[in-house]
Amino acid sequence: MRNKAVLDLHLVSDSTCETVIAVARSAVEHFKSLEVNEFVWSLVGSKRQVDKVMLNINPERHNLIMYTVVDDDLRKYLKEKATAQSVRCIPVLAHVIREISCYLQVTKDPNAHPHKLGDEYFNRIDAINYTISHDDGQNLWDIDQADIIIVGVSRTSKSPTSIYLAYRGYRVVNIPLVCSVQLPVDPATIADKLVVGLTIDADRLIQIRRNRLISMKHQENCNYVSYEQVVEEISEMKKICAKNRWPTIDVTQKSVEEIAATIIQFFNRKNNRTGDALY
């Protein structure tokens, strides 16, 4: 069996590195035979910081720099340093910016600085804090401040999906639905909110719950993994969602990212939005 090629991938940005990380990870997904060591260099805003990045590049290894740097002088300096060390340097947005410029015959804004630590950054932090404090049905007194409400039985990815959405800027409340226990909030009070129910195949849910019990050393909780109990829980959840006309998502074969993307589509449709994020 052939050994995997190893790449030291240096991701450089004068901002948060979110864009270059997303592009880089999407790209390397196409190379299953590649082993990648990822180095993230965010908030690189001076030549001294560029020098620090370059000093940490091992010349004995395969190296690649992917970057988003707005400042022309700093970008030029980074490319010069990379060339001097024979390191390939790829600007991840240059081609897209150039295509837009050529197509519309407009020049890019020289003062543009994506992802500045402005309102959008602090709004996202606020969304994360709100979502964490409203996990698992907590603090429902200010549920009216939520953008999205997620409901579902235990172990249907409500919490990780909520956190993922919060990172995108959405304020999320997630509420567990417990069989024979009344919904802790009056549906009439959240009629104007997007409420999404997460459902799942019963056999898959039992498997997830059983693994959870093993990890917590609580295997004696038989009802939690009882087929009849699980089927009843899922059925009751579907009835509640149908009664209140809340959309549902079957998460059996879906990743958190896919679940969140579907919820964002619901949100955009409800609010007549065409983008996929609040910012």
Swiss-Prot record:
Whether Transferase counts among this entry's keywords is: yes
InterPro entries to which the protein is assigned, alphabetical: Kinase-pyrophosphorylase, PPDK_reg
* Name of one Pfam family that matches: Kinase-PPPase
Give the transmembrane region(s): none
The EC designation for this entry is 2.7.11.32, 2.7.4.27
Please state what class of enzyme this protein is. transferase
Cite the binding residues for ADP. Answer: 152-159
Q: Name one GO molecular function term.
A: protein serine/threonine kinase activity
| Keyword annotations of the record | Kinase, Nucleotide-binding, Serine/threonine-protein kinase, Transferase
UniProt key word Kinase = yes
Reactions catalysed: N(tele)-phospho-L-histidyl/L-threonyl-[pyruvate, phosphate dikinase] + ADP = N(tele)-phospho-L-histidyl/O-phospho-L-threonyl-[pyruvate, phosphate dikinase] + AMP + H(+); N(tele)-phospho-L-histidyl/O-phospho-L-threonyl-[pyruvate, phosphate dikinase] + phosphate + H(+) = N(tele)-phospho-L-histidyl/L-threonyl-[pyruvate, phosphate dikinase] + diphosphate
HAMAP family, A to Z: PDRP
- Family membership noted in the UniProt record: Belongs to the pyruvate, phosphate/water dikinase regulatory protein family. PDRP subfamily.
Q: What does this protein do?
A: Bifunctional serine/threonine kinase and phosphorylase involved in the regulation of the pyruvate, phosphate dikinase (PPDK) by catalyzing its phosphorylation/dephosphorylation.
- Name of protein: Putative pyruvate, phosphate dikinase regulatory protein
